[in-house]
């Protein structure tokens, strides 16, 4: 983009632009017509049959490998971004030829060969090559109207990566990239994008004054082989100040729907729909002041997680969080609102402790096993005396459960109020 100079506007006509890597200058704008696609892969069209397998020769790409030790259970070659797709579906990598099966591929890096487990003839086969679509440290860049897909983005890196200040990334479809779909830095905005089916995670961001609004974030975190509880799922935000996450629809991700982790302060989650994410809904972890309000949650974390893990709203070793006016439907399983304290040390603004959190005026629909409350496996006394409070909430359960309400120990709803003084102005509706 150097030919246009700083502040230039570029227009991409409809069409597929393969293996392009754009490094914007200060203030540049990149716009796409409907049907403009940045595709980080090459088409594979020539195959030979070798010992009953189909082989593409001359594959010299080898993407940067990060965090190969952060593997999901049973995954092979996690952190290897050299993805292969058949008809827009990512195949599963295996690490030896004798494990090749239908739906898998084996990349023999020594021989520069990709082996496929299925006959590719008549199919569209693509191999991810380029590590990013649009990325630079310039400030004030705008990216809008593009489809960005199939980039060999390393773990924790993004296909669109605004590493400078004030990027605006809007109205794009970002899909099928190995690592992360979109990343921004301070005073950046991610607006009205459809971010889906990326291998590790949909979004990430860090810095001050960030706005995440109006995005659909769906079905991310399923195929990179990286453990999503280490980092993956819908979106993760780190070391932010004044982060606003508003009116997004985050659903069906493998991991948390939305996640603030490490030294986030003055965070707001407002008006989001968070549905059917495997690990839980919103997780605010080892961070500080936040407001989580007027969000709706359905079906998050209902995958057999114990303790208060998998809550629709989960606060881990964080303080000064107000949780109010949320609607939580956990009738298919999972926990409601969980405050969790463990031994996590200290961060930029003090100890990572679960204190001074207020949970009020929320409506929850629970199973008889779904939990609510505060638990600790470290310095429980500090958490219990730390000003955490539950009040004026409404709980709906199909039948009366025993010991669903936690404040250190577990209690019935009646004893949650009578013994520990929580939820005194709340109600439990059975049936």
Predicted regions and their residues:
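Extracellular parallel beta-helix/beta-solenoid repeat domains
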Residues: 1-431
């Amino acid at each position: 983009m150097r030919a246009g100079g700083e502040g230039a506007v570029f227009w991409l006509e409809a069409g597929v632009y393969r293996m392009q890597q754009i490094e914007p200058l200060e203030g540049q704008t990149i716009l796409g017509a409907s049907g403009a696609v940045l595709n980080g892969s090459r088409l594979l069209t020539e195959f030979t049959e070798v010992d009953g397998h189909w082989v593409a020769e001359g594959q010299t790409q080898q993407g940067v490998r990060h965090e190969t030790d952060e593997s999901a259970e049973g995954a092979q070659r996690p952190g290897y971004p050299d993805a292969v797709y058949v008809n827009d579906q990512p195949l599963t990598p295996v690490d030896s030829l004798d494990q090749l099966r239908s739906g898998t591929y084996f990349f023999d890096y020594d021989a520069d060969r990709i082996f496929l487990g299925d006959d590719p003839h008549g199919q569209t086969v693509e191999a991810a090559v380029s590590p990013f679509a649009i990325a630079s440290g310039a400030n004030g860049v705008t990216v809008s109207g593009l489809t960005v897909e199939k980039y060999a983005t390393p773990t924790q890196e993004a296909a669109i990566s605004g590493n400078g200040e004030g990027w605006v990334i809007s109205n794009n479809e970002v899909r099928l990239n190995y690592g992360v779909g979109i990343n921004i830095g301070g005073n950046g905005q991610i607006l009205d994008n459809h971010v889906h089916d990326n291998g590790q995670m949909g979004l990430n961001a860090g810095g001050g004054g960030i706005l995440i609004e109006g995005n659909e974030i769906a079905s991310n975190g399923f195929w990179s082989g990286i453990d999503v509880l280490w980092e993956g799922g819908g979106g993760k935000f780190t070391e932010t100040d004044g982060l606003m996450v508003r009116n997004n629809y985050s659903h069906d991700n493998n991991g948390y729907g939305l996640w603030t982790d490490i030294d986030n302060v003055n965070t707001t989650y407002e008006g989001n729909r968070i549905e059917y994410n495997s690990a839980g809904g919103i997780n605010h972890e080892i961070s500080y002041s936040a407001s989580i309000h007027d969000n709706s949650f359905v079906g998050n974390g209902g995958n057999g997680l114990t303790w208060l893990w998998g809550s629709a709203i989960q606060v881990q070793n964080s303080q000064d969080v107000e949780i109010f006016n949320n609607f939580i439907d956990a009738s298919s399983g999972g926990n409601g609102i969980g405050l969790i304290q463990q031994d996590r040390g200290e961060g930029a603004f003090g100890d990572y402790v679960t204190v001074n959190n207020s949970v009020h005026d929320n409506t929850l629909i629970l199973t008889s096993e779904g939990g609510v409350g505060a638990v600790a496996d470290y310095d429980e006394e500090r958490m219990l005396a730390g000003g955490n409070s539950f009040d004026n909430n409404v709980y709906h359960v199909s039948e009366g459960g025993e010991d669903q309400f936690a404040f250190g120990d577990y209690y019935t709803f009646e004893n949650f109020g009578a013994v520990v003084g929580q939820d005194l102005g709340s109600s439990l509706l059975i049936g």
